[in-house]
UniProtKB/Swiss-Prot annotation:
UniProt protein name: Ribonuclease kappa-A
Keyword Cytoplasm: no
Location of the protein in the cell: Membrane
General function of this protein: Endoribonuclease which preferentially cleaves ApU and ApG phosphodiester bonds.
GO molecular function per UniProt: RNA endonuclease activity
EC number: 3.1.-.-
Top-level taxon: Eukaryota
Enzyme class: hydrolase
Mode of membrane association: Multi-pass membrane protein
Pfam families per the UniProt record, alphabetical: V-ATPase_su_f (PF23489)
Length: 101
């Protein structure tokens, strides 16, 4: 029988902890980028043309903020998937403990 178990119990538990932390952090970052937090301006990928040559500079900056916000939410979704994988590995490890050899 093929086993889907590929991580040990400690690695799977570590994966869950890191996934939970990553999801919380990235969702908060996504929310703060979505409300156009001025503190995060250094993380917005803009050029001088975006500021000086655009007739409506705030709109362009807001679009860039929202783009980074969406990227944070996508990364949080990936962390959720990896957390689910780690949770499945924990369950498989628990099941393996109770199996008769």
């Amino acid at each position: 029988m093929v086993s889907l178990l590929c991580c040990g119990p400690k690695l799977a538990a570590c994966g869950i902890v890191i996934s939970v932390w990553g999801v919380i952090m990235l969702i908060l970052l996504g929310v703060f980028f979505n409300v156009h937090s001025a503190v995060l301006i250094e993380d917005v990928p803009f050029t001088e043309e975006d500021i000086f040559e655009d007739p409506n500079p705030p709109a362009k900056m807001y679009r860039l903020y929202e783009q980074v916000s969406y990227n944070c939410f996508i990364a949080a979704a990936i962390y959720i998937v990896l957390g689910g994988f780690s949770f499945c590995q924990v369950r498989l490890n628990k099941r393996k403990e109770y199996m008769v050899r």
